[in-house]
Amino acid sequence: MSLQGRLICWFLRRRFLPATREPIDVARVRAQTAKRVWLPPVPKGWQLREQYRVAGAPDAANAPLSGEWIVREGGAPRTILYLHGGGYYFCSPKTHRAIAFGLATRAEADLFSLDYRLAPEHPFPAALDDALAAYRRLLADGAPAQSLVIAGDSAGGGLALATLVALRDAGDPLPAGAVLYSPWTDLAATGASIHENDGRDPMFCGDVFARIAPLYLGTASATDPYASPLYADLHGLPPLFMLAGSTETLLDDTRRVAQRARAAGVSVACGIERDLPHVWPIYAPFMPEARRALDDSADFVKRVTTADDSARSQRSVHGQMGPGSDAQSNAQRAAQSSATSIPS
């Protein structure tokens, strides 16, 4: 691990880990996060649009869906729908700009980071409803499914996988692939790594997820496949690119999904990196391992999606996309190509 990586793990162990042993205080966590958030500069040649109101939210009593666009000047040949982490109860597109900027610029993709509704005010399935509505809005605005990738980290990674399952079950066109960073896929917390890596994980104690899960679940079962996609039938999903650290308490949430997806015939590139912390790609401005992870992620995104530069169309202020071309036949080759360079 790099010196920067060791310093980040030291900081997490000293400042973040102790808080996970305390009772969950939603208001305090949100306030501290808002106070400490670091906003990276917008990359040269790109624009940040803090908007994309989606008319027709799933629940008319709630405000319309919103989020942030990071858009390449002149348009981009592909689109990423990004779902941020934060245990379903805190964080936002702003807290995840570093990972969104890094992935978008490397993948040459316009990226929409969804500001989905948070628990406990909006329990399951609110976040899933919002993710589905945002994906369908992207399609309605002209982004071909073959040029779309859904990505997410931690809770957002689990939400991304659940979104794929729900789209398949509903008969919607599926995206070209998905990128999942340290996804939280088992809200029942049955993975052996929850206990085996307790004390090794620099960020989380082992029992914190069992305390967070009820905030999101409400009255739903922890094994509902749309809340915990580890328990879903994974057949027919597009290629998956997954990363997790070897000392994560959530490690088995990645490993078991990779195993079950492969058994269901899904192409999976799964990298388990030694000692790296939860969702380390978010540290790309500071950490070389994070930059390499984003490079690999972007390569996957490019390989599974349409890349017809002649078909680019600049996005409007409301996020409307122009047409692209079909790259469905590239999907399986792309995931297999990525898998050869990333250990599983």
Language-model segments: which ranges?
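Residue-identity detector for glycine
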Residues: G319-G324, A334
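Alpha/beta-hydrolase superfamily serine-hydrolase fold, recognizing
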Residues: A55-I70, G74-S313, G322, N330, ...
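A short, well-structured alpha-helix characteristic of acyl/acetyltransferase catalytic modules
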Residues: C9, Q332-R333
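A glycine/proline-hinged amphipathic helix-loop "lid/cap" segment
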Residues: M1-R72, T306-R312
